[in-house]
Amino acid sequence: MGTTNLTLDSESICDPNYDILFENAIYFVTACYLSVGLFCHISLLKIILISDRKYFKDNSFFVLFRADLFASTTLLLYDIFFGRIFMYIPQLCPFVSTFFSTPTIFLKVLYVAQNHARFVKSLSQIFMVLNRMSCVLMPATYNQFWNKITPIASFIMLILPFAGLWNIMISQVIASSVRGGFGVDYIKAVKWASLSLFQSICILTALGFTIVCTSVTFYKLACLSDRVRSIERSLCFTSISISCTFLLVAGTQLTFATCASCKTDAMYILQFLAFDTFNVGSAIIMFLTNRHLRSSMFSSQKKRAVTVVTVGQISTNTYN
């Protein structure tokens, strides 16, 4: 099927009717909490993959959680340095939008990466709640079971999102008007295969798993508190807390899928806030609920401080 490249000008993309100061204030506020989330995610990745790798590498939950961390980090980087900055800083729109007036590979790669990460977030949610449920249902064989399943789960999280992204990959990805700036959209090459359809299927499937698995986990924790180790119990409560943030995403996605009149500016902002809570919240919740991660982070900071002081003392002694 042949396609003709679409060319847009900045006047058709940029809307001058939005208050610049108000839009900039929205970006400043969102960039602040997204930056906190990005710092927490990078810190977690450093602890899990580098500084305390021996402790976490054999824990199947943290292997699954790594995928969530990478996906969230991708989304946070995209939002801070591209998505939100060009949406909420309208004064940039006339200059920057000219670079994206025609479909480009760069824009397509960004859009695919962003939405791949969103699919991974939903899929990792499914596997994490399954992991916690199996921990309380079969504590004796849980480790052996997930040692076999985790590589398969990791492969699924990497590959399955492309089942919902293939239409983007063959379509024209363009800049589109969003508030006073611009965002990224696409012209469907295959009309029925919309991204929102595939995302809704994935999110609603994850919602079903989340409700069932979290309910079972919560119930069994009350019954088997003596048979579940404290660290596993802590991870169960972590998973339950992350699931609560996912419910916000599922709720807004379900509203968009079923209510055509709800697609207003306020609802779009509410959807962004729901995704932000899910993206930022997972790392913050993990730090708040996991004592070992907190101690690892603070101990590494203390080591750096001691190193700086020691080096300073050596330098002083040398010059004396």
UniProtKB/Swiss-Prot annotation:
Q: Where in the cell is it found?
A: Membrane
One GO CC annotation, please? membrane
Q: What is this protein called?
A: Serpentine receptor class gamma-17
Task: Supply the alphabetized keyword list.
Answer: Membrane, Transmembrane, Transmembrane helix
Q: How does it sit in the membrane?
A: Multi-pass membrane protein
Q: Which GO terms describe its molecular function?
A: transmembrane signaling receptor activity
Single GO biological process annotation from the record: sensory perception of chemical stimulus
* Assigned protein family: Belongs to the nematode receptor-like protein srg family.
Q: Where would you find the membrane-spanning parts of this chain?
A: 25-45, 80-100, 155-175, 192-212, 237-257, 268-288
Keyword Cytoplasm in the entry? The reply is no
Record gene name = srg-17
Q: Which Pfam families match?
A: Srg (PF02118)
